């Protein structure tokens, strides 16, 4: 789980009156002033061994402590196989946290798929357990691979910090932004080409890219020769929020592949909370439940550039401001982390009842 999701869910659980303990490999200084208890355990830094090393360290810690019997464990899918026996022996109910099946390409992802399936089979066969998914389509995806009842699965969507991510007044300028992994398989290399094609049609746009990934250096080289493109390394949330405030349109270029079509991207909510219009590829992972929104335009992948140029050229300044307000309002009504926390609390109380 990314730190943003972890922090907001734990904060919500703490504010609800529950005692929260976090067991992971983080440096204790990261949680020095946090309201939850943090327990650091060791983990290997060798690729391919990180999860097994961390899982075994967590299991040793759990096996040696007796004062955690009256609790519910929330565990990432990569780790549950190392902890399942000890949790069962101690009669500790647990929730599987699945924020995404294996998302990387290559050998590592191939090795992770059997682990992911086994994790969900453990949910299916263990009486005092539930599994969380980020979207209904994610839940259906799980059921395509594992025989598991609807009652064992609940949706825990990504939320957004509405106080950290806030809008600024928009102008008529078209400032595009994408933040997240700058990986080739996420479609980000199509974004500089969008700037070039828009410019060829007489539309001035600027593009900001924030993150790291396997094509980050290639994107930086492109930006070096195009002053309308800026590439930044991954940054703290406060700095990210400032960049989002300056933008007009948030981009969702991830293609219509299984891994993206079942997702609930954090950036989508952060775009909305910042009052951005949204443009991206049309699939379930990018859509909201009600997809008919003037401030959000999703198109087939093969039309990504042409439809963007048509939309950008049609946007007047007053329309951008109106859509910005509607986008923020949607975030306030539908995307607060509290909604996710409430869903998690409900699952916890059901397991303890």
Give, region by region, the residue ranges found by the protein language model.
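Short His-centered aromatic/hydrophobic patch
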Residues: 74-80, 98-99
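Membrane-proximal helix-turn-helix segments that form the acceptor-binding/catalytic region
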Residues: 96, 102, 111-134, 145
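Conserved donor-binding/catalytic core segment of Leloir-type glycosyltransferases
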Residues: 132, 169-195, 208
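Carbohydrate-associated surface elements
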Residues: 137, 159
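Nucleotide-activated donor-binding/catalytic signature segment of Leloir-type glycosyltransferases, i.e.
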Residues: 217-241
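A charged, aromatic-enriched C-terminal amphipathic alpha-helix characteristic of glycosyltransferases
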Residues: 303, 316-349
């Amino acid at each position: 789980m990314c730190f943003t999701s972890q922090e907001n869910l734990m904060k919500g659980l703490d504010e609800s009156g529950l005692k929260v303990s976090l067991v992971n490999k983080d440096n204790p200084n990261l949680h020095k002033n946090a309201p939850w208890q943090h327990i650091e355990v060791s983990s290997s830094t060798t690729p391919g061994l990180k999860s097994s090393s961390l899982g075994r360290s967590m299991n040793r810690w759990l096996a040696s402590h007796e004062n955690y019997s009256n609790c519910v464990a929330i565990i990432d899918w990569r780790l549950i196989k190392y902890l399942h026996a000890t949790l069962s022996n101690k009669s500790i109910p647990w929730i599987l946290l699945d924020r995404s099946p294996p998302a990387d390409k290559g050998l590592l992802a191939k090795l992770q798929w059997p682990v992911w399936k086994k994790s969900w089979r453990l949910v299916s066969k263990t009486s005092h357990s539930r599994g969380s998914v980020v979207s209904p389509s994610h839940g259906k995806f799980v059921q395509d691979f594992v025989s598991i009842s609807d009652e064992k699965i609940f949706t825990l969507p990504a939320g957004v910090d509405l106080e950290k991510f806030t809008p600024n007044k928009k102008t008529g300028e078209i400032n595009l932004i994408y933040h997240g992994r700058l990986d080739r398989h996420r479609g980000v290399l199509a974004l500089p080409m969008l700037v070039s094609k828009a410019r060829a049609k007489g539309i001035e746009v600027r593009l900001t890219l924030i993150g790291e990934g396997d094509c980050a250096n290639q994107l930086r080289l492109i930006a070096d020769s195009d002053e309308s493109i800026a590439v930044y390394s991954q940054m703290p949330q406060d700095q990210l929020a400032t960049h989002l405030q300056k933008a007009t349109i948030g981009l969702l270029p991830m293609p219509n592949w299984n891994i993206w079509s079942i997702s609930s991207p954090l950036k989508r909510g952060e775009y909305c909370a910042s009052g951005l219009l949204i443009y991206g590829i049309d699939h379930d992972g990018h859509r909201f439940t009600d997809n008919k929104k003037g401030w959000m335009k999703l198109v087939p992948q093969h039309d990504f550039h042409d439809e963007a140029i048509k939309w950008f050229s049609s946007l007047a300044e007053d329309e951008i401001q109106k859509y910005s307000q509607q986008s923020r309002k949607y975030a306030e009504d539908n995307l607060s982390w509290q909604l996710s926390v409430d869903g998690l609390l409900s699952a916890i109380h059901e397991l303890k009842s």
